[in-house]
Amino acid sequence: RFLDDLRVPAAGHRRFLFVVLPMAPWVFGCAGCAYAVLPAVMGDRTGSFGIAFSGLLCLVALGCGLFIQQVGKRFDDVSSARAIIIALTMTLPGLGIAALAARLVSPWLALVAAAVLGLAYGMLLVSGLQEVQRIAGPEDLAGLTAVYYSITYLGFFVPAALAVVSHWLSYPVMFVGGVVLAALSLGVVLMFSRKHLPSALAH
């Protein structure tokens, strides 16, 4: 009985699996790259100002994320995954600029990358929540929201994972790999953007 109470049937909804699931880890993946990975990569250039620079990147990323959350809801479309598509599209240049910043060890480019990744983070977070609200019924909303956040939190492991892989691959290469993975996620969402809509919206 207890386990039955913990079940979230809406988590098996095809729209959740093919639209929300591919984008969710990128929420805090983008944020983590902006305020954890980039400061570390710029360490040799920022020197004694490293802590201040890290704080600046965090402020820029989270500030841009907060800003886009206020306006991002306007891009929502009940008949498609338009807002999520926009959010994942923002992720591509963000990671691309991060790769260039890492290659050139340029704090200025890192600042730009943090801003773009911050925008992507905020847009991803709000667009995913809106999609979850449509998929879940009233009884499943709290549970599905918890599942959604649990998946987004996987992004917090990105900095640690990149630090481990950096023994074999450079950060520019890993950021480019991130662009490829984000593009694949975007491709999946594009394929299912107008499919498996919640029954109340399908007509």
Please state what every model-predicted region is.
Residues 14-34, 111-116:
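Pair of pore-lining "gating" transmembrane helices in MFS-fold secondary transporters
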Residues 179-203:
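Multi-pass alpha-helical transporter architecture, strongest
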Residues 1-20:
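Juxtamembrane intracellular "pre-TM" segments in multi-pass secondary transporters
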Residues 121, 127-174, 178-179:
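A late C-terminal transmembrane helix in Major Facilitator Superfamily
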Residues 36-52:
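Short amphipathic helix-loop junctions that connect adjacent transmembrane helices
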Residues 81-126:
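C-terminal transmembrane helical hairpin of 12-TM major facilitator-type secondary transporters
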Residues 54-77, 90-94:
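Transmembrane alpha-helices of Major Facilitator/SLC transporters
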Residues 25, 56-59, 63, 115, ...:
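Transmembrane alpha-helical cores of Major Facilitator Superfamily
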